[in-house]
Amino acid sequence: MKLLSAALLGAGLACSAANAETVLKLQTSTQSGAFEYTYVVDTWGPKLATMTGGEVKLEFTPINSIVDRGDTPEAVMGGVLQGDLTAVSYFTGRNPAFAILGDLIAGYDSVDQVQTFCRHGGGREILQELWDATLPGALHVVGCAAAAKEALVAKVPINGVADLEGVKIRSPSGLAATVFQKAGAAPVSMSLSDVFTSLEKGVIDAADASAYIN
């Protein structure tokens, strides 16, 4: 389960009152054909527009569509984007703590537990402190989201941990990659959009990628 995704806004935008017809452009961490992307575009975005009486509208874009997935914070700071809805595990290279908040392997049983931690257990505040330490005063954490349990697909039989030995597996960066490596696999970092062709061409043997619904 991808544990925490942060909706980030530039600090100035987050603190200002919304004007009529305010449109916020957000880049997501999912590709356009994924269920999660379709849901936020068709359901979540319109719901927010209705709740705000049309004052705030969200314009979502797929992963890597405007900037590289790892560069969204700077894009928000520079005004290219007004926010992002993305996996914070992408920022593990900036601070290892993002790996723990972003992809705590087997740490939660349900998305409700993730939301409870975020909203009532101090998770959002911890994530804000982490961003403040990384890019002081630049970004505001609006909230958290969680994806469902992800699929593990493979071209080779994997019936237990021992079968992971030597398997080239697409894995999120950070803690997930460390766990797979400790199990004997060879983690490979790549975008979800590259997973399908990489499996077909033998670039990877398996993939920890996306929710089952995709």
Where are these predicted regions, by residue range?
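Sec/Tat signal peptide C-region and signal peptidase I cleavage site
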Residues: 15-20
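Extracytoplasmic "Venus flytrap"
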Residues: 25-42, 63-68
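Contiguous mixed-secondary-structure segments that line small-molecule binding/active-site clefts
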Residues: 42-46, 87-186
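Pocket-lining segment of extracytoplasmic ligand-binding domains
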Residues: 88, 175-177, 186-214
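Alpha-to-beta junction loops
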Residues: 53-56, 72-86, 185-187, 201-209
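Short, polar/charged alpha-helical segment
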Residues: 34-59, 174, 178-179
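Short beta-strand-to-loop elements that line the ligand-binding cleft
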Residues: 58-67, 168-171, 185-198
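Bacterial N-terminal signal peptides
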Residues: 5-14
